[in-house]
Amino acid sequence: KPLWRL
């Protein structure tokens, strides 16, 4: 789970 777009 990245903390930006996706």
Swiss-Prot record:
Cystine bridges: none
GO-annotated molecular function: toxin activity
GO cellular component, one term: extracellular region
Residue list for modification Leucine amide: L6
Tissue distribution of the protein: Expressed by the skin glands.
Keywords, ordered alphabetically: Amidation, Amphibian defense peptide, Bradykinin receptor impairing toxin, G-protein coupled receptor impairing toxin, Secreted, Toxin, Vasoactive, Vasodilator
Major localization class: secreted
One annotated GO biological process: defense response
Record localization: Secreted
Family listed: Belongs to the bradykinin-related peptide family.
Protein function: Vasodilator. May target bradykinin receptors (BDKRB).
UniProt name for this protein: Bradykinin-related peptide Pnor-3
Native organism: Pithecopus nordestinus
